[in-house]
Amino acid sequence: MASRNITVSEASRPALPRHAKLRFDETRQRWVILAPERVLAPDDIAVEILQLCDGARSVSAIIDQLATKYTADRAEIGTDVVAMLQDLADKGFLTEARESAP
């Protein structure tokens, strides 16, 4: 179980927790999230979003970047991104970046 559940919003700054790593698996020829005793194989869209989850960018900035890149409706992309990130957070594969001291 995840030690702390988060609620994802556009203000969130998501990142993978220390125990989870996004890696390209040469054997499977696909991206995977590796965590202790768990492996998740996200689809290509999820991988693109996860690569933007660096703890510095807000969900809002991620949505803006994707909406611009794909010339898509921001509201629709926003709904999908928040739902996907919330699902990963609920499963313990995503956490909120800690505030850093100035």
Swiss-Prot record:
Pathway(s) it belongs to: Cofactor biosynthesis; pyrroloquinoline quinone biosynthesis
Keyword ATP-binding: no
Gene Ontology molecular functions: quinone binding
Disulfide bonds: none
Keywords, ordered alphabetically: PQQ biosynthesis
Family assignment from sequence similarity: Belongs to the PqqD family.
Description of how the protein assembles with itself and partners: Monomer. Interacts with PqqE.
Role description: Functions as a PqqA binding protein and presents PqqA to PqqE, in the pyrroloquinoline quinone (PQQ) biosynthetic pathway.
Protein name: PqqA binding protein
Source species: Rhodopseudomonas palustris (strain BisB5)
Organism taxonomic ancestry: Bacteria, Pseudomonadati, Pseudomonadota, Alphaproteobacteria, Hyphomicrobiales
